[in-house]
């Protein structure tokens, strides 16, 4: 049996001969022989194996490297991205809370408006204000509106700004200027503008239609970062009139023409769009509810206008010579037939005499004249009943402008209306055509 010979100066070591070191492997009781031979072979050209383990320190270095590699998570995100994601989550949470608070406030206001719009006393007062406003000059109207705007809150300011912006995009005939309503509904705009109404109700309908149509089409900067807002196409964020979320719409909204270097921030854009959408939605709802309170007075004025047109057509129609009593021609009778049953409270004499008056029946009805309170209520002037509580109607109709102001009728529009009615009553009294006599 041949015993292997080793070079002079080399000693075969076992794991038990190697002293304990600070190596991470020192905790083991034995070491494999392969480690000893590997260490001896690596350092054989140095003239001998180092007595206190270079192999131990090398193993420690490899252990530290292994530990460092273990701490490296190639599948995770960098700390900067984690911080950015947390900031986006916090911003989205704050925006959601603010949106819910604003939504509760808007819903409360809308419910209150709906309740008030059904109040009969409120509608009577509002009708009186409209009639008073209708007789004011341009300067008086501007001064009155400016005084009322001083009492508005932020929600009402948003509403008025939206409505006035829509008014600014319209011509005098109610048609939109340029292509400002390209994203709207042209057919609905034509229908709303064709309905005449006092106090600019037709223009308000145009503003409502244009606003709802504008919310339906998203602008490029609104669709650029739509992936940051998962509820961008949720129905709760979309007002009435916006188109539903379809695959084609989502595909179209994902495209953007906005440059990368835009001054709009990736984080600030969803919040700005959300607040603007909430403001526009609330403004449109307020505009829709604002027409409810005027519906009764609008219907009344429409009926009154139709009645005056009917009576004027009766007066202007020529009569046949052979007809007894000067009855109107068959054509005029056919025009008067649809109007039967609508206004039968006034006598034929008062209709003929006061057909051009703005409020013929209440102004010259003797039954109402005998009750001053009921007469003023029929004229929408019941708020001034206390000014004439000790007077008879014969004395009231003789008052002039200065005397009315002394009585407490400080509003110029109300005094003008009273003077017109007083003149009608005096003329009917002279001619003996007071209704109910």
Swiss-Prot record:
Residues 208-217 have a biased composition (Gly residues). InterPro entries: SAM (IPR001660), SAM/pointed_sf (IPR013761), SMAUG/VTS1_RNA-bind (IPR050897), VTS1_SAM (IPR037635). PROSITE patterns: SAM_DOMAIN. Residues 243-259 have a biased composition (Polar residues). Residues 1-40, 175-262, 295-362 are annotated as: Disordered. GO terms for biological process: nuclear-transcribed mRNA poly(A) tail shortening; protein transport. GO terms for molecular function: mRNA binding; nucleotide binding. It holds the Pfam family Vts1. Coiled coil: none annotated. Keywords: Cytoplasm, Nucleotide-binding, Protein transport, RNA-binding, Transport. It is found in: Cytoplasm, Cytosol; Cytoplasm, P-body. GO terms for cellular component: cytosol; P-body. Residues 367-428 form the SAM domain. Residues 185-207, 344-361 have a biased composition (Low complexity). Monomer. Binds to RNA. Belongs to the VTS1 family. RNA-binding protein involved in post-transcriptional regulation through transcript degradation. This is RNA-binding protein VTS1. It comes from Yarrowia lipolytica (strain CLIB 122 / E 150) (Yeast).
């Amino acid at each position: 049996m041949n015993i292997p010979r080793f070079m002079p100066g080399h000693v075969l070591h076992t794991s038990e001969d190697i002293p304990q070191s600070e190596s991470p492997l020192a905790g083991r009781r034995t070491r494999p022989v392969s480690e000893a031979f590997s260490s001896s072979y690596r350092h054989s050209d140095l003239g001998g194996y180092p007595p206190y383990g270079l192999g131990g320190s090398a193993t420690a270095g490899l252990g530290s490297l292994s530990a460092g590699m273990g701490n490296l998570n190639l599948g995770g995100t960098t700390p900067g991205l984690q911080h950015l994601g947390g900031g986006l989550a916090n911003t989205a949470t704050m925006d959601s809370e603010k949106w819910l608070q604003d939504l509760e406030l808007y819903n409360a206001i809308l419910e209150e408006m709906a309740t008030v719009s059904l109040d009969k006393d409120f509608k009577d007062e509002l009708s009186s204000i409209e009639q008073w406003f209708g007789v004011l000059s341009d300067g008086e109207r501007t001064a009155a509106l400016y005084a009322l705007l001083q009492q508005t809150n932020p929600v009402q300011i948003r509403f008025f700004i939206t409505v006035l912006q829509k008014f600014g995009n319209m011509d005098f005939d109610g048609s939109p200027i340029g292509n400002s309503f390209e994203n709207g509904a042209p057919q609905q705009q034509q229908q709303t503008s064709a309905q005449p109404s006092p106090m600019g109700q037709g223009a308000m309908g145009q503003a409502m239609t244009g606003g709802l149509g504008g919310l339906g089409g998203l602008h490029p900067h609104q669709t650029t970062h739509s992936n940051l807002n998962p509820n961008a196409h949720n129905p709760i964020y979309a007002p009435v009139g916006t188109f539903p979320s379809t695959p084609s719409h989502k595909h179209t909204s994902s495209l953007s023409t906005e440059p990368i270097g835009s001054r709009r921030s990736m984080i600030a854009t969803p919040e700005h769009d959300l607040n603007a959408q909430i403001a526009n939605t609330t403004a449109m709802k307020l505009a829709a509810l604002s027409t409810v309170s005027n519906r009764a007075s609008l219907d009344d004025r429409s009926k009154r206008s139709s009645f005056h047109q009917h009576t004027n057509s009766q007066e202007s129609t020529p009569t046949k010579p052979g007809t007894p009593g000067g009855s109107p021609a068959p054509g005029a009778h056919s025009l008067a037939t649809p109007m039967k049953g609508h206004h039968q409270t006034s006598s034929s004499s008062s209709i003929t005499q006061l057909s051009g008056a703005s409020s013929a029946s209440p102004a010259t009805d003797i039954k109402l004249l005998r009750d001053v309170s009921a007469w003023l209520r029929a004229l929408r002037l019941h708020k001034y009943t206390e000014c004439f509580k000790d007077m008879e109607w014969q004395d009231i109709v003789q008052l002039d402008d200065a005397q009315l102001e002394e009585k407490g009728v400080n509003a110029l529009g109300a005094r003008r209306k009273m003077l017109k009615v007083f003149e009608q009553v005096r003329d009917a009294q002279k001619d003996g055509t007071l209704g109910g006599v």
